[in-house]
Structure formats: C-alpha cells, structure tokens
C-alpha cells in the first residue's frame, strides 16, 4: 500500500484510478457472481460496470477513499444503513435507480442504488468523506 500516491495531482489521481480498476478486475475474478450479502440490508449488493466507473472516478481523488476500495468485500458485507435519499434524475448515472441508500462502515460511506429494472441493490460508490479522511490522516501521522 506504500506505492499509492497520496497527493492530489492529475498524475496521482491517474495512478489511483488504475489501481482501483485493477483491484476490481481481480475482485471480479474471485467473485464471478459479482455480489456480496449485506447483513444489514438482508440482501445481496451487486457490483456492476457502473459501480466500478462511479467508484474509480470519485475514490481516486482521495488517498483514503482509494484505500477503502481495497476492503470492498468487508464493506459490502458489514456496512449499515444510515440514510435513504431520492436520486437526482438529472444525473445520468442515477437515472436507473429508484432510490439511493447510504450505508457506513467505520468512516467509509457506501452508496447503493435500488435498480428500477431488476430491483437489485447495486453498489454505486465508495468514499471516505473529507472530514473522516482528515481525522484518519491526523491519527496516522502522530
């Protein structure tokens, strides 16, 4: 994990994007059904192409969010619901969902969408909100 750049330059973000994409490719090879049972929701959370795209676009912008992605299975299994919200119909990636469910696992925020066509819960994005990332950074730098 030491080879993950911590900066916010375009080059740092590009490296983290590639690491996230490579991680998902490996994860899918180990989880060919592309789903994990979430204990709190009592249903499977599916990982789809949209999951990968949305996550690498958002998580790669922050070092702590990138680290969180590497704990994908653990997060999908153990995150607990904290909120539910309507989708933004003007956002292309959210149009396919009836609603978004916000879950937390430690400081990690997992957003899951209820897909209209299949009624499946689909991983939308994984991030560590800035406040949490700042706290973690302060703790690890002591």
Where are the language model's segments positioned?
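Ribonuclease/tRNase effector modules and their secretory precursors
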Residues: 1-142
């Amino acid at each position: 994990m030491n080879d993950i750049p911590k900066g916010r330059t375009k080059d740092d973000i590009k490296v983290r994007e590639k690491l996230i994409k490579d991680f998902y490719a490996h994860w899918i090879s180990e989880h060919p059904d592309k789903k994990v049972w979430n204990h709190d929701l009592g249903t499977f959370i599916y990982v789809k192409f949209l999951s990968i795209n949305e996550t690498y676009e958002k998580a790669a912008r922050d070092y702590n969010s990138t680290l969180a992605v590497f704990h994908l299975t653990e997060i999908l299994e153990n995150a607990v619901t904290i909120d539910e919200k309507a989708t933004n119909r003007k956002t292309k990636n959210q149009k396919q969902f009836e609603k978004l469910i916000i879950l937390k696992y430690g400081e990690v925020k997992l957003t899951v969408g209820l897909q209209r066509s299949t009624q499946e819960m689909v991983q939308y994005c994984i991030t560590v909100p800035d406040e949490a990332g700042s706290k973690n950074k302060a703790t690890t730098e002591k």
